[in-house]
Amino acid sequence: MSMQTAPIKKITLSHLQAKKNQEKIIAITAYDALFAQIFDPLVDVILVGDSLNMSFFNQNDTLSASVKMMLYHTKAVCAGAKTPFIITDMPFGSYKDEKTALKNAIRVYKETQASAIKLEGGKEKAKLVKTLTDEGVIVVGHIGLMPQFVRLDGGYKIKGKNEEQQKKLLEDALSLEEAGVGLLVLEGITTPIAQTITQKIKIPTIGIGSGKDCDGQILVWSDMLGFFDSFKPKFVREYLKGKELIQNAIQQYADDVKKGNFPNELESYH
């Protein structure tokens, strides 16, 4: 009689770390219960990203996202997705010092069912990471192209193109690992250094625009499902023409209403 493994009820950090060098981690963003529920059986990780400020609220960058906003959307995602490991982005300004970071991270844990918080920054954030992990908070790191630094950097610029940047990225990764981050997001860095970092550190890397050698991949759902046609980053693969499909459906609905074809007898009460 063959032994069957029981299905995982909730993916934990241990499950994800066990995938290192074994099986790719599948991650996606979500901002509400509806899409979180759709994604639930298909992904390992859901990130409630501050990217919602751009894709959900149509802002130019992520910087005006607030803790209140992130808590609201994290609650919604947790209501829809029961199995994936759920990560909440700490928005700009919410971890400017240890006291502020602890206060906001503890709020995330107390007010939502999030599995972890994510913050941007390299070795300069190592002390903060240790403080948070010492309090029982799972921290996900994020290095490379960091959207919260877009104004300082003068735009969305790929990192790791020269030796100095590559050295810094590796130092950042090693420092964050030592400080206790459970996972590390690599965004917008060149493939060779992403591969090196993935090989050098023991925790899983999740890439976005950082080549295929990372331990996992993440995309913003509205990018990969074709909801934005004004701009598409090079690293995005579009798996659906979502905007077009929905507009076609709404057009059919509008046509039916105008022609008196909706509602029909079967869709009416008597």
Swiss-Prot record:
GO terms for cellular component: cytoplasm. The keyword Ion transport does not apply. Mg(2+) binds at D50, D89, E120. Pathway: Cofactor biosynthesis; (R)-pantothenate biosynthesis; (R)-pantoate from 3-methyl-2-oxobutanoate: step 1/2. It comes from the Bacteria. The active site is at E187 (proton acceptor). It holds the Pfam family Pantoate_transf. It catalyses: 3-methyl-2-oxobutanoate + (6R)-5,10-methylene-5,6,7,8-tetrahydrofolate + H2O = 2-dehydropantoate + (6S)-5,6,7,8-tetrahydrofolate. The keyword Cytoplasm applies. 3-methyl-2-oxobutanoate binds at D50, S51, D89, K118. GO terms for biological process: pantothenate biosynthetic process. One of its GO terms (molecular function) is magnesium ion binding. Its EC number is 2.1.2.11. It is found in: Cytoplasm. Binds 1 Mg(2+) ion per subunit. Its cofactor is Mg(2+). Keywords: Cytoplasm, Magnesium, Metal-binding, Pantothenate biosynthesis, Transferase. Belongs to the PanB family. Homodecamer; pentamer of dimers. Catalyzes the reversible reaction in which hydroxymethyl group from 5,10-methylenetetrahydrofolate is transferred onto alpha-ketoisovalerate to form ketopantoate. This is 3-methyl-2-oxobutanoate hydroxymethyltransferase. It comes from Helicobacter pylori (strain J99 / ATCC 700824) (Campylobacter pylori J99). The lineage of its organism: Bacteria, Pseudomonadati, Campylobacterota, Epsilonproteobacteria, Campylobacterales. The gene is panB.
